[in-house]
């Protein structure tokens, strides 16, 4: 069975993430969506909220063979512990590739048996970023349906707007 881990902060999970998960399923038998913690990032949602939201979204979409987990160490260590041989990374633009390629080189030094698969974003999701969702959430009456599922919007709205 070919298994891949798709790590990210998912702060929050977006249609861009979901598209990459769906496309990963065309390549792999099982995909683990790994809600990761990067100590150098400032998050809008807590670790528990990001994990819970990702899990609820994946469940609502009825994906078979997609599982959600969380981890705060090196992704390559998670893959090794769980006998996963592939890491999937999404690429929106050239600057994403530079960052992800450097990450691949570090991971390769840590464990050369785990490979990274780069998936370019679909054209319709090139502009979809969690950062934009966070910024747009502060505007009232903005349509975020192109960025996030309704479940995500409602959860964010109840936390930040309906206070």
From Swiss-Prot:
Superkingdom assignment: Bacteria
Localisation per UniProt entry: Cytoplasm
Family: Belongs to the bacterial CoaD family.
Gene name linked to the record: coaD
Known EC number: 2.7.7.3
Known pathway: Cofactor biosynthesis; coenzyme A biosynthesis; CoA from (R)-pantothenate: step 4/5
HAMAP family reported for this sequence: PPAT_bact
Major place of residence: cytoplasm
InterPro entries: Cyt_trans-like, PPAT, Rossmann-like_a/b/a_fold
Description of how the protein assembles with itself and partners: Homohexamer.
Biological role: Reversibly transfers an adenylyl group from ATP to 4'-phosphopantetheine, yielding dephospho-CoA (dPCoA) and pyrophosphate.
Residues bound to ATP: 9-10, 17, 90-92, 100, 125-131
GO biological process entries: coenzyme A biosynthetic process
Molecular function GO labels: ATP binding; pantetheine-phosphate adenylyltransferase activity
Name under which the protein is recorded: Phosphopantetheine adenylyltransferase
């Amino acid at each position: 069975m070919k298994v891949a881990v798709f790590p990210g902060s998912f702060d929050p999970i977006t249609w861009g993430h979901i598209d990459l998960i769906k496309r990963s399923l065309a390549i792999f038998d099982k995909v683990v969506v790994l809600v990761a913690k990067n100590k150098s990032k400032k998050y809008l949602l807590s670790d528990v909220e990001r994990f819970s939201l990702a899990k609820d979204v994946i469940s609502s979409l009825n994906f078979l063979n997609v599982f959600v987990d969380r981890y705060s160490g090196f992704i390559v260590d998670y893959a090794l512990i769980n006998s996963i041989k592939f890491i999937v990374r999404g690429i929106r633009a050239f600057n994403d590739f530079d960052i992800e390629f450097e990450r691949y080189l570090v991971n390769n030094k840590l464990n050369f048996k785990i490979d990274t698969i780069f998936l370019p974003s679909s054209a319709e999701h090139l502009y979809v970023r969690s950062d934009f969702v966070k910024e747009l959430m502060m505007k009232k009456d903005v349509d975020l349906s192109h960025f996030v599922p309704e479940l995500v919007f409602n959860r964010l709205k109840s936390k930040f707007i309906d206070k």
